[in-house]
């Protein structure tokens, strides 16, 4: 026997008001002024300064005390708003566990969350986002990558980006926030290496970089 679920009809006036509010919100979002480049530069500069302060005196600093004078403040490429770009996540149906080699010789287990497709300086590109098997926070998307600066201007073991998973599938990738794995500062950290699929065939001159040519030798 089938049952029919009767739901009360939404009154006309509240429904009309709801439609008006949603339309107004959509219009406001569409007409939102673009971010002022000066504000963006200030935001990234403040984020970098906060990292330096935390790494210098924070109780959980990854930089050993005997290397702080050498490494701090951290080295960065100049802030470039063109390295912040919109990306679309194409979810992955692949549930296979992928072993990631690490800096300590161990293996970390990852799964593909999907491919982030974007355009950077006019060139279409793609990076795979991963989630770690057994991680307490599956909302964190992990994007380790190499590019043509790896090993010369940046750490040979790649750089990292993180994103918080959302329901829209639309993200902002900001390479000005790309950072070195902690094993660059201290070999006590275990850092996964980027997989072959995340090796960009362009130089990404944004985010963290070596301070001097000698810094890359002390990994």
Segments the model singles out, each with a brief description of its role:
Residues 2-15, 19-20, 212-219:
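Short, basic, low-complexity termini and linkers enriched in Ser/Thr/Gly/Pro
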């Amino acid at each position: 026997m089938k049952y029919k679920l009767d739901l009360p009809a939404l009154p006309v006036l509240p429904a009309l008001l709801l439609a008006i509010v949603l339309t107004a919100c959509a219009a406001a979002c569409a007409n939102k002024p673009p971010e002022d480049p000066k504000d963006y530069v200030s935001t990234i500069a403040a984020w970098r300064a906060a990292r330096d302060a935390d790494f210098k005196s924070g109780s959980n600093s990854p930089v050993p005390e005997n290397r702080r004078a050498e490494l701090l403040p951290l080295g960065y490429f100049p802030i470039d708003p063109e390295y912040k770009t919109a990306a679309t996540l194409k979810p992955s149906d692949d549930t296979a566990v992928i072993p990631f080699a690490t800096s300590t010789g161990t293996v970390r287990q990852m799964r593909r969350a999907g491919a982030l497709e974007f355009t950077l300086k006019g060139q279409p590109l793609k990076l795979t986002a991963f989630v770690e098997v057994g991680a307490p926070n599956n909302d964190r998307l992990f994007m380790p990558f190499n590019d043509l600066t790896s090993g010369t201007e940046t750490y040979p073991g790649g750089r990292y980006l993180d994103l918080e998973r959302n329901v829209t599938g639309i993200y902002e990738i900001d390479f000005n926030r790309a950072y070195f794995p902690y094993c660059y500062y201290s070999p006590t950290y275990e850092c996964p290496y980027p997989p072959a699929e995340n090796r960009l065939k362009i130089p990404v001159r944004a985010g963290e970089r070596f301070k001097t040519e000698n810094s890359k030798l002390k990994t």
